[in-house]
Amino acid sequence: MEIEVPVSELRKNKVFVATPMYGGMASGMYCKASCDLATTATKYEIDLKFFYLFNESLVPRARNYCVDEFLRSDYTHLMFIDADICYSPEYVLTLSALCSEEKPIIGGPYPKKVIAWEKVRNAVDKGLGDDDPLDLDKFTGDFVFNPTTGTTQISLGEPVEVLEVGTGFMMIRREALDAWREAYPQFAYKPDHNRSEHFTGDRYIHAYFDTVIDNDSWLGEGNSNNSDRYLSEDYMFCQLARKIGLTTWLCPWMSLQHVGTYVFNGSLKDLGRLEYAAHGADMKHRPYVEERRKKIQNTTALKTKKKGKRK
């Protein structure tokens, strides 16, 4: 999707980028992206500030501290970016342009830290790795969002309304946070003293983000969907936001990466089942490609034949 917005309009928004950083650690890809974002904002004279919260092991509490820091500032838009997300700086400017009264909560899709092997298998069956096996990496993701009820397909070229979107890459308007706080006064709490200037244990802040069970016992009558789902802190925030008319949106064209660890498996015994095992530089030999295609064709023909018999 292409969005043309005058720089003068982007300058009207003051973006507060908040990153909870447990252990004070961030991925190199996040650091590079953030340097690029700072450079881009400076180039176009956009007021953008980074805030890092170190060594808070409880993620919901870290997010609530970040919100409180934002609300005590004069910035207009809160941008959550987690320390393990790789992104394009243009995406932040895009969210800033789109985040409005109509779209007060908006984010980008990033993959969960899991490989969806069934999708890789389906991509192989469709021949999407025939030209370049490295292309199969594009089909490994399960994404952090939930579509609205009844949605069967989405347009990749425009923002789409969703039930929930992850805070790993989410922008929120100040007015949305104000409305949320007024609607749910019961979530005010006194944070523990954490040896910092603004969190001394003698004032209230708000729990915009918390992990809850989605039922009336936890959230109060009328605030839950009684699904008994265990809601993560971002999904809880989105669900309660939607209850008071604050819509949540996703930009499906954005391509984000989620950095994590992976245990690399495999054995020579298992490779032996292939009879032919290519080495890393061999991207051309496909000894089983015709065998696979014939198998798929035969399976398709068999299914068609069975359908014909039923008639």
What function would you assign to each model-found segment?
Residues 1-57, 61, 301-303, 311:
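N-proximal low-complexity "stem/linker" segments adjacent to membrane-targeting elements
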Residues 5-16, 182-311:
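C-terminal catalytic/acceptor-binding lobe
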Residues 12, 73-76, 101:
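Active-site acidic short loop of glycosyltransferases
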Residues 42, 100, 242:
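Anion (oxyanion) recognition and catalysis
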Residues 64-77:
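Active-site nucleotide-sugar/metal-binding loop of Leloir-type enzymes
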Residues 67, 88-219:
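Conserved catalytic core of nucleotide-sugar-dependent glycosyltransferases
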Residues 75-86:
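Short beta-strand-to-loop acidic/aromatic patch adjacent to the donor-nucleotide binding site
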Residues 77, 104-105, 248:
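Short, Asp-centered acidic motifs that coordinate Mg2+ and/or phosphate
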